[in-house]
Amino acid sequence: MTVLVDTSVWSLALRRDAPPNSPEAVQLTKALESELVVTTGLIMQELLQGFLPERTQAEIRRRFSALPAVQPTRDDHVAAADLRNTCRRAGVQLGTIDALIAQLCITYDLELLSADRDFEHAARHCKLRLWAGTGA
């Protein structure tokens, strides 16, 4: 199964003070070893905005240039708005970018690797699948 790795996992893994054996780091390593990891521009943008040192930004650009990228279409944006509204009606708060990331996973048949609990709540109300780390 192809995996989209969310900003929350990348940022934990790239922090200098992150424990090397954190569940998120272990899952990211496992996902990368499967060679079935994809990304999207929004996730790279969020990471680049969050890390100021130029060396760290260069490392992010280098890592992300090796990954296939999925790009949202107009239909994905419309479907993401619908998904967000569905979640909101169910009492689940999902941000605009998170709704689009979830929709990309649904559109491209991807599993999402995330440390963000909002996605767990959203997955109860849509076809979003979360990566369990059991392999591809």
What function would you assign to each model-found segment?
Residues 10, 44-47, 119-120:
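A generic structural signal for short hydrophobic patches within well-formed alpha-helices
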Residues 1-39, 49-62, 136:
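Short, well-structured N-terminal submotif of metal-dependent ribonuclease cores
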Residues 6-7, 47, 80, 105:
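Generic structural signal for small/hydrophobic residues in well-ordered secondary structure
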Residues 6, 40, 93-95, 116, ...:
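Histidine- and aromatic-rich ligand-binding microenvironments
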